[in-house]
């Protein structure tokens, strides 16, 4: 799916898009909240608030999205699992379809344009040598000017896929390999 965001934050042009091209949201599954086992989403029910939407994301979207990605999801990576509810007028007419999917967001948490299917992407947050990175309270990594407060300065990129081509390495295996590699990069 994709859409445009106006200067005032208004969303227009909400439409289906080919995941190979630019888009803001990749649908992983559809949930019909009308079949949810309570009257919470009945014909006269109000739309869920932000807190309830976050709960629904955890309850209904996580496992299905992980299956959609064949188990390959980096929860600390570029993409987050998110729900999209129908517009308010469609909700009032009885539409209870919740779309679960994946999106990449900017610093403000707004979905940004991305290209390609998530399953085919490197999900890691990658920074270039020389960039400085701040870590916020939610452990989100953001590149910042090095004159600003930051916790990391990138000295090198290392592809662990080259070293561990057949499996995901344990944290201990990563640390063992990276100790010498990163120390050498910092000294250079």
Label each region the model flagged.
Residues 1-188:
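Primary mode marks residue(s) on the alpha4-beta5-alpha5 output face of response regulator receiver
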